[in-house]
């Protein structure tokens, strides 16, 4: 998208200077805000704020007592093999997180485990460490299989196993949809120790790849189990569970919540599991600052660019509800000289992996994504999450903002709220058990950016429309050629 938008900027001399104008206005605005008193700016902004009904939190609401805290000062206290302890040190893992402290000891003792913890709590290492510790004692192929709901999460889990097993000679492979089946079959024939897979593609290989079997599987992990079931993987999971052995198999189930579906799944697949719950309700980590910004109609793009100016030098994920918005905003950011890349479901697997790699490597500071990126992706350096579109359910909000403030780090999320989003925000606040504070801004200052942002957005929309027409024309051309070939075939007969 960056390259394509770059061509647009050359078409218009006016647009090429928009970024410079916005930067200059932003600097001027910052000086004005520093000169203005806080009291004045608050009174200016409060005149235009949208009134929102406050929800009272019931005083008699039942609160579950937290379990007694389990802590370890280092990974060495868990009695891991030296190679694993050294790998943790190399990764700057100073001490186990709460879910790791709860889940690793019973897992090392051989128990099935149910891990319930909020997003960003270090769940992946909580099951990877005990598996690798056991693998060191008994190395054999197809030792463990991890099931994940998305291709991106599966790749992240593979990277965690590779990092933690870097001193142990561990072989891993990632088996997901959207990639070549034959290449994956060759990877499986190399006898990896750990297989990380999405359920559908794993089932394809179990049924169609000669010589591949999980009859000697020792560990099965179902990560983000609530999402696995939400995405209708239930029937495939049932088929997989019937194929793989139950005797001699240890099973770990990790989820953000304990629903009735998950309870049914754990009864079907786990034996006398140890439940390790760090949090029994949806919540966000303490190091995350969550705010909202009330946006008048038609100004969401302008407010977004204002925020990106404020956060120059930081890494930002912008979440949208649609693929078109993700593409458009990525183009808008690039046209205005913010380095951005898009991640959404219309991209093929190589494009999605490429976008993530650019962001993780710091070659792009902004990732504009649909909810495909909201769950499970471990990108440690995300500073800011911006909800350009408010998610329609509270779970999605929790998982979006959980992309920042991970594993003890601090972070911030800002939600851009229009008058049509108030009901959605009230639901989110009810789940969080608190009201989200409003960002105090001078809307008159933000409005100075409006003309430049609107002009740039118009250029991006025109370019997207042009590309869509070209794509449709190519599609018609292909269909025409296919129909002509079919007619020729009929005539020959």
UniProtKB/Swiss-Prot annotation:
SMART domains: DEXDc (SM00487), HELICc (SM00490). The keyword Repeat does not apply. A motif (DEAD box) lies at residues 223-226. CDD domains: DEADc_DDX47 (cd17954), SF2_C_DEAD (cd18787). GO terms for cellular component: cytosol; nucleolus; small-subunit processome. It is found in: Nucleus. Gene3D superfamilies: P-loop containing nucleotide triphosphate hydrolases. It catalyses: ATP + H2O = ADP + phosphate + H(+). Its main location: nucleus. GO terms for molecular function: ATP binding; ATP hydrolysis activity; RNA binding; RNA helicase activity. ATP binds at residues 117-124. One of its GO terms (biological process) is maturation of SSU-rRNA from tricistronic rRNA transcript (SSU-rRNA, 5.8S rRNA, LSU-rRNA). PROSITE patterns: DEAD_ATP_HELICASE (PS00039), HELICASE_ATP_BIND_1 (PS51192), HELICASE_CTER (PS51194), Q_MOTIF (PS51195). Residues 26-42, 51-62, 483-493 have a biased composition (Basic and acidic residues). Residues 104-276 form the Helicase ATP-binding domain. The Q motif is unique to and characteristic of the DEAD box family of RNA helicases and controls ATP binding and hydrolysis. Belongs to the DEAD box helicase family. DDX47/RRP3 subfamily. Interacts with the SSU processome. This is ATP-dependent rRNA helicase RRP3. It comes from Candida glabrata (strain ATCC 2001 / BCRC 20586 / JCM 3761 / NBRC 0622 / NRRL Y-65 / CBS 138).
